[in-house]
Structure formats: C-alpha cells, structure tokens
C-alpha cells in the first residue's frame, strides 16, 4: 500500500508544516502584516497595497485561506478578508512551543 512520507509524522507536526508553508513567501507575510496592521476586514483589492499583480495576490490569498490563516467572506462582487483569530492563536502557540523546545534543549537562553 502506498503512502505519503508525510504520513510518517504525527498530526501536530503536519498541521504546523501547513502553517509554516503558508508563511514561506514574503508576499504572504506582507499580506498578513497588512491585515494585522489594518485591524479590520478589508473589502477591496489588497493588490493595491503590494507590488504584485492582482492575479498573484489572489493566489497568495488562496494559500493563506487554505492554511486557515485568513477568512474571506463574499459580499456581492467583493471579498472581505481578515485574519482568522483562532488560527492566529494556534500559530502563536506553535511558534512558542518550537521556540521553547529549541531554546531549552540548546540552552541558548534567548531573551
């Protein structure tokens, strides 16, 4: 029976990998930063805020939405985008757990 190599890892690691993959492009980080700074759901074209085409921005929005980091709600012909607070908290916990583990085991004592 065939299986994917990712099947060898537990679900917590696989979930973390999905989040990290979504963060692995500067455009997606810029989109998250923009949504966080505006603190409201954005109606309209986020591509006006980035040096990328509308099509490229939409592809990155899709990646972020598939990872659950943002929500997109259709309102007529526009989509309202905002951060997903539950997933953002989950992301923070994943980062904190990984940071604590690395810092503790390597004795870096980062401050």
Over which residues does each language-model region extend?
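Alpha-helical residues within the helix-turn-helix
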Residues: 48, 65-66
